[in-house]
């Protein structure tokens, strides 16, 4: 069974036991969170929400918090000998999916 969930403005296809990296959540490492924004359930029983499936929830464990790889933003203005280099690292939360309940 799989589910499509929404968290942090993005959608993820998850199965039990999967590890996903989502936008940073306010939760302690090792704690459990419940995601009730389930857009679709698939597998044996197929159901699509409008916008969310009622009564469906996904339970996940917070594995760790971290920062992604550095992205380089480089801007250059021609004929001015002007340029700007800036780096960015996005915070993330790693989740391990424990259970999908329909």
UniProtKB/Swiss-Prot annotation:
Any one GO molecular function term: rRNA binding
Keywords: Ribonucleoprotein, Ribosomal protein, RNA-binding, rRNA-binding
SUPFAM superfamilies on file: L21p-like
A cellular-component GO term for this protein: ribosome
BP GO annotations: translation
UniProt-listed Pfam families: Ribosomal_L21p
Biological role: This protein binds to 23S rRNA in the presence of protein L20.
UniProt xrefs under HAMAP family: Ribosomal_bL21 (MF_01363)
Family to which this protein belongs: Belongs to the bacterial ribosomal protein bL21 family.
Subunit architecture: Part of the 50S ribosomal subunit. Contacts protein L20.
Name listed for the protein in its UniProt record: Large ribosomal subunit protein bL21
Organism this protein belongs to: Nitratidesulfovibrio vulgaris (strain DSM 19637 / Miyazaki F)
Chain's gene name: rplU
